[in-house]
Amino acid sequence: FMLADERRRGDRYVLAMPVRLEWKDGNGQTMVEEGLTENIGASGALVHLPRGLPEVGSIVNLYVIDEKNREVAVEAEVLRLERNAAHPQAALQLVSSIEKWQKKLYDKAPKRIAALHASDEYDDF
């Protein structure tokens, strides 16, 4: 059991990566939604899902595509939802494969962000 303020450890990185979420709805129907990460942390992510959101408390399969177009698959619990019609989001807490997440995504995030900003410098015409 963790208190809300203890759950989030470490930095969160603002990084948009393609994601796919799969979960079962209340009727047992498999739901699939695609979107983007808003930010990632050491053990979770905030994701933007434009069409549909899973329920709070549900367990989802989260697939994130890294910069080399490889899929990183983890399991996560939906902690909260932002039901903003223009920008719906789900806050996810990993429940499996946390070390894989950190090694393949979180630990590489600062370098990836720096590379994105470096390429932006050349866009100022």
Give the residues covered by each predicted segment:
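Structured alpha-helical
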Residues: 1-125
